[in-house]
Design a protein with these regions (language model features):
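Ribosome large-subunit tunnel/peptidyl-transferase-proximal elements
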Residues: 2-121, 126, 163, 172-173
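Short, solvent-exposed beta-edge and connector elements
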Residues: 32, 145-146
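Solvent-exposed, flexible loop/coil residues
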Residues: 70-72, 145, 156
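Extended, charged amphipathic interaction segments
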Residues: 120-143
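C-terminal edge-of-domain segments
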Residues: 147-175
Length: 175
């Protein structure tokens, strides 16, 4: 794993591109909350592309929720509590915008796989790596009383995904 400067936005992929049948996609400076992207990435890692897209579409329709495991209780960061959802999930939410961006990213990786490998079905590929890193910060301020000001920053997110096929390559018969 490559090291990165924590104070600066991530440039390029964070993992080495190693794998026999590997396809990648990257989205830069997306206007979505980093917390939502982190939890979606953690949830879809290890699933096939079709399973991930189907689940995220159900999240967009508010039929299934994304489980929230970090920053879901009261604490130093303020009240960021997420309510418990149906089933044995615990805290979770329905992040619409982040789900839409992840569906676009997965479809982009599948298109890249179709371009690169003619004999592999991208629907059967597995998501081996997915990450959400903080992107650019547009700094601003809000004037307050008595000459003070409070920061009003706009945060963006960089997303990356690797999908991989683990089976044997299917040979097509040529006539």
């Amino acid at each position: 794993m490559m090291s990165r400067n924590q104070g600066q936005p991530q440039s390029g992929y964070t993992q080495l591109l190693e794998g026999s049948f590997l396809a990648t996609a990257r989205a830069v400076n997306i206007d979505v909350h980093h917390k939502h992207c982190y939890h979606i990435a953690k949830f879809i890692r290890g699933k096939t592309t079709v399973q991930a897209i189907d689940y995220l579409e159900r999240v967009m329709r508010k039929q299934d929720a994304i489980p929230y495991t970090r920053r879901s209780r009261k604490g130093k960061g303020g009240n960021t509590m997420a309510g418990h959802r149906k089933g044995k999930m615990g805290p979770g939410a329905y992040p619409y915008k982040a789900s839409r961006e992840f569906i676009r990213l997965i479809n982009s990786a599948m298109d890249n796989a179709r371009q690169r490998y003619d004999t592999i079905d991208p629907d059967e590929m597995v998501i081996t790596h997915v990450a959400a890193h903080r992107g650019q910060i547009s700094r601003g301020f809000r004037p307050r009383a008595r000459g003070r000001a409070t920061p009003k920053n706009h945060y963006q997110v960089n997303l990356e995904i690797f999908i991989e096929h683990f089976g044997e390559e299917v040979e097509e018969d040529e006539f």
